[in-house]
Amino acid sequence: MKVVDMHCDTIGELLADHLKGGTMSILENPLHIDLKKMKKGDYLLQNFGLFVHLEKVKDPFAYAMKMVDTFYTELEAYPDQIGIVKTWEDLEKNMAEGRMSAMLTLEEGGMCLGETALLRDFYRLGARMMTLTWNFQNQLGYPNRMELHEGESYPRFLPDTEHGLTEKGIEFVQEMERLGMIIDISHLNDAGIWDVLKFTKKPFVASHSNARHL
């Protein structure tokens, strides 16, 4: 069975390693995803998310651009194994040539600094999907509420049904829809998700989210 994986953080981990002088490669590494693991797992497509931690990075856009460079540098080194896709036709071509496919995606709309021009720049560079938020409020919207209980090391997320998309967030989802960039609602709060439904017409995805009920 062919595998399509909607999200991984491999590129950011490779960049962090390289900035420390490391030599980890997309071909083989101790992370969850590398080309050898993908080939063994019969992968069709891997989405490579570029994640920026807004509270730890001074210039989110500049850091994201470093990850874009890492994405292309790593994957273009193995053209016989994997090809970068921007369209459905690219995916079909890779399938016909026996190659796996990679798609560039963005995790944290705040890396666009509230500027649709930067969103379009990411699209021109090949990004085809983006989450509007991560775990922090940004120019576009809000995550669900976090509560850290005594004795627990990881916060619990509680539904936020009050704070929808900002005006800038609405502008972004409409521009993403115009461009053909997939809206990813993972990490977005409940009110924001309802606004995505209200202000867009095309399908959207939740790339790495769990269902509350089955």
Which role does the model predict for each range below?
Residues M1-Y154, L158-P159, R212-L214:
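N-terminal hydrophobic targeting/anchoring segments and the immediately downstream early-domain regions
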Residues C8, L188, S209:
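Active-site metal-binding loops of divalent metal-dependent hydrolases
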Residues G114-R124, H149-V205:
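Histidine/acidic residue-rich metal-binding segments in metalloenzymes
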Residues D190-A191, A211-H213:
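Short, catalytically relevant binding-site loops at active-site mouths
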